[in-house]
Amino acid sequence: MTVRIGVVGPGGMGRAHIDRITGELAGGAVVAVHDIDEVNARRVAEPIGAKVFGSATELVASDAVDAVLVASDGTAHLEPVLAAVAAGKPVLCEKPLAPTAAECEQVMAAEVAAGRRLVTIGFMRRFDASYLAMKAVLDGGELGEALLVHCRHRNPSAREAYRATMAITDTAIHEIDAMRWLLGEEIARVRVDVGKSTRNRFGHQIDPLTLLLETISGVRVDVEVFVNARYGYDVQCELVLETGVVSLGDQSVVSRRDASGARHRITSDHNDRFHAAFNAEVQHWISAVAAGGGAAGDGAGGAASASASTAWDGYAAAVVCDAGVRSLAAVLGGEDDGAGRVDAGGWVPVSLAQRPALYA
């Protein structure tokens, strides 16, 4: 079976997914696209013979579309995701699932009403070979339990439209989900620290900043977010265990040593660094849909994959992000956020709704 895929948002990340589905992966074909920029939609659709739709809901409703991939701006995710669930069609949604935790709850409610999981979130680090190897060491238990995690997320530059809060909601959200998945537990509280900012930023940006997470069992995670680092796209993670340390390797094929010294290439962006992970994630989703599943690895395709994410994961990440944004607001304002939710140390508790049985 060839899965007929409709893509909402075929620019940037969406275009990268179209290219991988068309040129690298098996079992899927992009047959429909929708973009608010109709010129771009036609530019992308014409070479692959896809149909251009005037709205996301029209695309989702089409009998020619089996499954939907949503890669539009995060503020526009909710409508096509809810439409896909209502139509009983599997949907792979890039992060975030929706702009707010309340909207993520709408998606979960729709899935619960439908009685099946149809939504997969694009948290590709769960499919990255380095993160998978790190999780295997932790889960194996040979080095004891996790105590601390040190994360670094550095980008070459951020566009002017990148707001201070996006360091949490658009960038650190990947670390937030990766830590929930890696450590196998929820995050209990969040704190944001800010200090000196780089000169290489737009004036409204706070860069770098540090996000501190504490899990239910007490594991401390520090996340450095530096989106105007200039030198490249650099994601690092060090897991401190009771009798050892596990770190992500340098993401290079080769290292070079010559008269000028030793060096290796730094990746340029997320598509460069996580290309293989993106491929594995999307292939997993296509294969699950082809096998009769809804969410990746769910349903007729077999047991749910340990790497595949759900609407619950999208919701949980959104709640943590909301807490981080409140902490940042308190730090910048120098006072409580007005709702009594920030303690004297700047920590904001994370309060999750009861997990529906569908996501157990």
Swiss-Prot record:
Q: What class of enzyme is it?
A: oxidoreductase
Q: Which InterPro entries match?
A: Gfo-Idh-MocA_inositol_DH (IPR050424), Gfo/Idh/MocA-like_OxRdtase_N (IPR000683), GFO_IDH_MocA-like_dom (IPR055170), MI/DCI_dehydrogenase (IPR023794), NAD(P)-bd_dom_sf (IPR036291)
GO BP field = inositol catabolic process
* Coiled coil feature spans: none
Q: Does the keyword GTP-binding apply?
A: no
Oxidoreductase as a keyword of this entry, yes or no, is yes
Q: What is catalysed by this protein? A: myo-inositol + NAD(+) = scyllo-inosose + NADH + H(+)
Q: What are the protein's GO molecular function terms?
A: inositol 2-dehydrogenase (NAD+) activity; nucleotide binding
Which Enzyme Commission number(s) are listed? 1.1.1.18
Which family does the UniProt entry place this protein in? Belongs to the Gfo/Idh/MocA family.
Provide the function of this protein.
Involved in the oxidation of myo-inositol (MI) to 2-keto-myo-inositol (2KMI or 2-inosose).
Q: How does it assemble?
A: Homotetramer.
What's the protein called, per UniProt? Answer: Inositol 2-dehydrogenase
What's the source species for this entry? Beutenbergia cavernae (strain ATCC BAA-8 / DSM 12333 / CCUG 43141 / JCM 11478 / NBRC 16432 / NCIMB 13614 / HKI 0122)
